[in-house]
């Protein structure tokens, strides 16, 4: 059970870090390339 919990925590941290890096790289405030910003 301990190894399963470690694997689950590793996957969760990996996806959370991926989501955070993707959100920061696709931030519309830093890259005003979208047509929504006038």
UniProtKB/Swiss-Prot annotation:
InterPro entries: PSII_PsbI, PSII_PsbI_sf. SUPFAM superfamilies: Photosystem II reaction center protein I, PsbI. One of its GO terms (cellular component) is photosystem II reaction center. GO terms for biological process: photosynthesis. It is a single-pass membrane protein. The keyword DNA-binding does not apply. It is found in: Plastid, Cyanelle thylakoid membrane. Keywords: Cyanelle, Membrane, Photosynthesis, Photosystem II, Plastid, Reaction center, Thylakoid, Transmembrane, Transmembrane helix. The chain crosses the membrane at residues 4-24. Belongs to the PsbI family. One of the components of the core complex of photosystem II (PSII), required for its stability and/or assembly. PSII is a light-driven water:plastoquinone oxidoreductase that uses light energy to abstract electrons from H(2)O, generating O(2) and a proton gradient subsequently used for ATP formation. It consists of a core antenna complex that captures photons, and an electron transfer chain that converts photonic excitation into a charge separation. NCBIfam families: PRK02655.1. PSII is composed of 1 copy each of membrane proteins PsbA, PsbB, PsbC, PsbD, PsbE, PsbF, PsbH, PsbI, PsbJ, PsbK, PsbL, PsbM, PsbT, PsbX, PsbY, PsbZ, Psb30/Ycf12, at least 3 peripheral proteins of the oxygen-evolving complex and a large number of cofactors. It forms dimeric complexes. This is Photosystem II reaction center protein I.
